[in-house]
Amino acid sequence: MKKSSLLYKIINGIWDMCYIWKTEMRNVFRDEGVLIFCILVPLGYPLLYSWIYNNEVVREVDTAIVDLSHSHSSREFIRDYDASPDAKATYYCNSLDEAKELVRRQAVHGILYFPADFDTKLNRGEQAHVGVYCDMSLMLTYKAIYQTSQAVASHINSGIQITQAGGFTDRDDEITTEPLAFDEVPIFNTTGGYGNAILPAVLVLILQQTMLLGIGMAAGTSRELNRNRELIPVSEHYGGIFRIVFGKALVYFMVYAVMGMYLTLVVPKLFSFVSMVTWTTILGFLLPYILSCVFFGLMLSCLVRYRENVMLLVVFTSVPLLFMTGVSWPLSNIPGFWQGFSWVFPSTFGIRGFLRISSMGDSLSDILPEFRALWIQTGVYFLATCLVFRQQLRSARLKADLTAEVAEEEDEAEEIVDS
């Protein structure tokens, strides 16, 4: 077969791509750092994170009580508060400073404060206040204390309304306290817990972040092992852009196709999270998401000079990226600039799409904006990766030529000296 024929070039390109794939795959399993980020972390970290929040809600949160009123009304409030499943009146303090000290020592996670005029204002028909102080270092305890206080206050308010209304029948009392009856039925997050709300987003983010860490660490290793500190080695197999890009991308796509199915199908089932995912939908959704993450990581790998650099580039972005998706913070309250900035990352559309698939049972046709955005990112980052690797290949060849010229000059100088 002639070397100039198209068929020969195609076969040779496929052969070189397979060689690059084999080399990169071998490096993934031989490099302990890459193996940890690409295999062990995606396997183990979701289990640990899901196990920690598997209870969904916290119960019997310790609370300090500062009752300066010492009245029947304040004791009724405290009794109802303590009877709730989510909170518990643990300590009774004589002052607010004493209660703050308990919070500082983490003996309690919140304070209920009743001023001295609490019962007096209620008897006068005036508005009375109950101070609720919460430790916001953990949102679950804050939620338990705050919502329990609100529920007890609403219950006591209903009793005050009934007394002041002076109704004659139970129906009059119902209309007074609840003129519009409604039933609160959670549709998607049926448990109302932290796990079902946040963990699906975290699982998708783990795919992107561990992939970026693994690709970046592998790139740093390649530079450190290269004599010229270049990302791409000078070899006959690394003679074309597409064979390099496809060979490297195929490695991470194969690894993370398995990890993606594990994170989106196996982990939610293990911990009984709400999951309405179907095989066909998640396969179609993971294809553009994983591809966009792979090409995004390969594009950024040119910035990594040393293995440790990738930790500085990737790790600190996890929490901001989660916020910018609109999962843990309302999207309407995120400034337009940061919303636009979040579109750079595949995790933004990946998390939004997966949450709708998992919690609402949406199909691909229902999440077309996110699905199209992921394919657009795949195309854009693929082209950007090709441009970056083209520049890296040119730089590697140039430095190799310069090194060869210097070596030849040194050999000639040695021959002249010897003669």
Per-range role (PLM):
Residues I14, C18-K22, N196, H237-Y238, ...:
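Alpha-helical membrane-protein architecture signal
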Residues V28-L35, I206, G247-F253, A257, ...:
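Loop-to-transmembrane-helix entry motif
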Residues S73-F77, T148, I215, F295, ...:
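Hydrophobic alpha-helical segments typical of transmembrane helices
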